[in-house]
Design a protein with these regions (language model features):
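Metal-associated gating/positioning segment near the N- to mid-region
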Residues: 49-114
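Histidine-rich, glycine-flanked metal-binding segment
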Residues: 1-54
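Divalent metal-binding segments
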Residues: 61-70, 89-101, 121-131, 148-159, ...
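His/Asp/Glu-enriched, well-ordered alpha-helical/loop segment
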Residues: 200-217, 221-226, 294-295, 299-301, ...
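A glycine-rich helix N-cap at a beta->alpha junction
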Residues: 109-125
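C-terminal cap of metal-dependent C-N hydrolases
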Residues: 11, 316-319, 370-436
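Divalent metal-coordination and catalytic microenvironments
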Residues: 11, 29, 48, 59, ...
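Histidine/acidic residue-rich metal-binding segments in metalloenzymes
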Residues: 131-301
Length: 440
């Protein structure tokens, strides 16, 4: 095809069937040629670079509306684009909660007006709105339903089986779950945190049993109602053993923080900056997460970008908020793990592109395939970099990886043929669009 808008040339292209040296031709925001491409308005030489399909971060909290001093859709997606991310899924625990069509419409409007990447939103599921979820889960811009079984930032708690089952039994789309048992954690808090301000107790308060029990409860209810559940930020070896046996019902997410940091060191070195829910745990749990990545149990790696200001995080535990920023460092940290042989680059792409397609049924994205959106995450696997607080675009302005030297960096973010980021600089703000999904 002649007169292409853009050719990506001389790079190593990660196609669904594997990596190969081939050209990719783009026109009108779509991939139109995969092969020998000539005659374009612009050609980018990608020698020594890996051309990934556009990668997605499927768990972000951008705090808008209601918490704009921590983050906005604009600043959060700026950070995403700088981190090589072409699209984000944002969570419903804002103020007001994303539990009505009106709240969803507001966030979609803000995304179109201000986002630097494409986007979709989780719709919050509660016992109060459960009777409407069959209809509302299919609204444009919705990537799935989200429930919180354990209290976290925001006010979107479904602690009892009755509350969880009300959501599970209404709807067909994927239901993402924050699985921590609120009742067990409340009992733990009375004893473990009594007269203690030690953040190192965070993984004792929110212990293995609280995670495992909630995961077992929600998977049991999902089986009862033939519902697909996506269990988020798994942290324990016990949960992985259980989920490995229940892949017919549940898909699995892990976070870079749980793959990279471990207790007690993280709490000694970072203090409350390492405080997140579920908590960072001991190394034997981390080893189990890596085993689950290796054997295919894990479907998605996402950031759970959950920013708070340094002032908020510098308070006295346990009154400090849980959560760390991570959308800008998600891919760099995973590239460093790939460089160190912890996983292949193909598996990385699977966890951040094909996994999201499988779990969420994303339409025409996340794959270098003809007629799909021309989204690409281009990385230099050999580039070394030192992560700093100063380079973070998030309003929170910090990262738990400040000062960490890594190998592998995103050098270009292309969204629908538009070069949004190149070599650490934002070049162009796209007109962002809601991500589309295949609905049954």
């Amino acid at each position: 095809m002649s007169n292409l808008d853009l050719i990506l040339k001389n790079g190593i292209v990660f196609l669904p069937q594997g990596r190969t040296s081939i050209d990719v031709g783009i026109k009108d925001g779509k991939i139109v040629e995969i092969g020998n491409c000539v005659d374009a308005n612009k050609t980018i030489d990608c020698t020594n670079l890996y051309i990934f399909p556009g990668l997605i971060d499927t768990q972000c909290h951008f705090r808008e509306p209601g918490g704009e001093h921590k983050e906005t859709i604009e600043t959060g997606t700026m950070a995403a684009a700088l981190g090589g991310i072409v699209g984000i899924f944002e969570m419903p625990n804002t103020n007001p909660l994303t539990t009505t069509p009106e709240a969803l419409d507001h966030k979609i409007s803000r995304g179109i007006d201000t986002a630097y990447t494409d986007f979709a939103y989780y719709f919050g599921g509660t016992i109060q709105n459960s009777q409407n979820l069959n209809e509302w889960e299919n609204l444009d811009g919705v990537c799935g339903i989200k429930i919180f079984m354990g209290a976290s930032t925001g006010n979107l708690l479904s602690a009892t089986d009755e509350e969880v089952e009300a959501v599970v039994s209404n709807g067909q789309r994927v239901m993402a779950v924050h699985a921590e048992d609120e009742f067990l954690m409340n009992e733990n808090k009375k004893t473990i945190l009594k007269d203690s301000n030690d953040v190192g107790m965070h993984c004792k308060w929110r212990d293995v049993n609280s995670s495992l029990n909630a995961t077992k409860r929600v998977v049991g209810l999902a089986k009862k109602h033939n519902r697909h559940v996506h269990v988020l930020h798994i942290t324990t070896s016990e949960e992985m053993d259980f989920l490995r046996k229940n892949k017919d019902t549940a898909t699995v997410e892990v976070l870079p923080n749980h793959l990279t940091l471990n207790a007690p060191d993280c709490y000694e070195n970072l203090g409350t900056l390492a405080q997140q829910n579920p908590p960072i745990r001991e190394k034997h749990h981390q080893d189990a997460l890596w085993k689950a990545i290796e054997d295919g149990t894990v479907d998605i790696v996402a950031s759970d970008h959950a920013p708070h200001t340094l002032e908020e995080k510098s308070g006295t535990y346990p009154n400090t908020p849980s959560g760390t920023p991570g959308v800008q460092t998600l891919l760099p940290i995973m590239l460093d793990h790939a460089s160190n042989g912890k996983l292949s680059y193909e598996r990385l792409v699977d966890l951040m592109a094909y996994g999201p397609i499988r779990v969420h049924k994303i339409k025409n994205k996340c794959s270098i395939t003809k007629n799909y959106d021309a989204d690409f995450t281009i990385v230099d696997p050999k580039k070394t970099h030192v992560i700093t607080n100063q380079e973070q675009a998030s309003k929170s302005a910090w990262t738990p990886y400040d000062g960490k030297k890594i190998t592998g960096m995103p050098v270009m973010t292309i969204i629908r043929g538009n070069i949004v980021m190149r070599e650490g600089e934002l070049l162009e703000k796209i007109t962002a669009q809601p991500i589309e999904f295949k609905l049954d």
